[in-house]
Amino acid sequence: MSWQTYVDDHLMCEIEGNHLSAAAIIGQDGSVWAQSATFPQLKPEEVTGIVRDFDEPGTLAPTGLYLGGTKYMVIQGEPGAVIRGKKGPGGVTVKKTTLALLIGIYDEPMTPGQCNMIVERLGDYLVEQGL
C-alpha cells in the first residue's frame, strides 16, 4: 500500500459524517511522504520543532506548534508519542511512529476526539508494523 493510500483512505476518511481538513505523513527529517491536496507547506523549522518536542516533551508549549505558518496552542498530548494543538474551533493531532509523523488537521464540525481517533489509530497500526 502506498503512503498516499494511507492518507487518502485512512486519514481523510469519513467519521460520523466528518472529515479532516488536511492530513499528511512525513518523515522525521521533514520529507513529505504523502499529503492531502489541502495540506499546508511546512517549513523545516516547524518539523524540527515537532521532532524536538517528541524528544524533549514540553518544548513547544511556550511558543506553540506551527504548521505552514499557522500557530496552534499546544494542549495535553502523550509525551513522546502524540502532540495535540488547538486553534479556535479546530486543531491538529501529530502522532509519531517509528519512522514517520502523521499529521491530521481538523475544523468544526469535526471534534478533537474524532481527529485523535483517526490519526492515532493509523499511527498505532504503523507502529505495530514497525513503520
Swiss-Prot record:
Disulfide bridge positions per record: none
Parts forming coiled coils: none
Stored SMART domains: PROF
Domain of life: Eukaryota
Gene Ontology annotations for the cellular component aspect, listed alphabetically: cell cortex; cytoskeleton
Keywords: Actin-binding, Allergen, Cytoplasm, Cytoskeleton
Gene Ontology molecular function, alphabetical: actin monomer binding
CDD domains: PROF (cd00148)
PROSITE patterns: PROFILIN (PS00414)
Regions crossing the membrane: none
Subcellular location: Cytoplasm, Cytoskeleton
Subunit field text: Occurs in many kinds of cells as a complex with monomeric actin in a 1:1 ratio.
Role summary: Binds to actin and affects the structure of the cytoskeleton. At high concentrations, profilin prevents the polymerization of actin, whereas it enhances it at low concentrations. By binding to PIP2, it inhibits the formation of IP3 and DG.
Family: Belongs to the profilin family.
Name of the protein described by the UniProt record: Profilin
Upper classification of the organism: Eukaryota, Viridiplantae, Streptophyta, Embryophyta, Tracheophyta
